[in-house]
Amino acid sequence: PSVFVYGGSIMPGEHPDGRKLDIVSVFEAVGAHAVGDIDDDELLSIERAACPTIGSCAGMFTANTMAAVGEAIGMSLPGSASAAAIDTRRSDIAFASGHAVMNLLRLGILPRQIMSRGAFENAIAVVMALGGSTNAVLHLMAMAFEADLELELEDFNRVAARVPHLADTKPHGKYHMVDIDR
C-alpha cells in the first residue's frame, strides 16, 4: 500500500514594486541584465526576492504537475497538491496520509488497484486542464508501465482534444500553484 505525500511548492516572492516573482523572474532578469535593460541592483533585488521560502518551484512545472497527478490518479489525498510547503496544513496532510495508508494496508489495497486505466485518463485530463509540464507524458507513461497498463502518446492527444486548458499558471500564465489552493 502507498500514499504519495507531496512537500508543497514555494511561495511566490514579491518585488519592492509589488510584482509577484518566481524562478522564471530570475531567468528573465538575467537575460534583461545581459542586454543592459536592468542594472546590477535590480537584478540582485529580483534574485533576493524571487524564492522566499522552501518548496518546489512555484509554477506548473514538473513537481506541481506530478503532485496534481498524484491526486487525480488516486495516490494522494484530495487537496494535498496545492498547499504550499510552508502551509500549516502540511502536517495535517501528512498525518491524514498516514491514516489513509494504514487503512489501505488493512483493506489490502495496492497501488495497481487504484491506478486503473480510468485513473490514468483522469490524470491526463488534469494535466491538460492545468497546462501541466510536458514531463508528465514521460512520467505517466513510466507509471503506466509499472502498473502493467498500456499508455500511448495518442492517449494524451485524445484526452487533450476534449479537455480545455483552464488554468492560467506559470510559466505560460500569471498564477502560481498556491493560487490554485485559494
What are these model-derived regions, one by one?
Residues 1-122, 127:
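Active-site cavity-forming subdomains of large catalytic enzyme subunits
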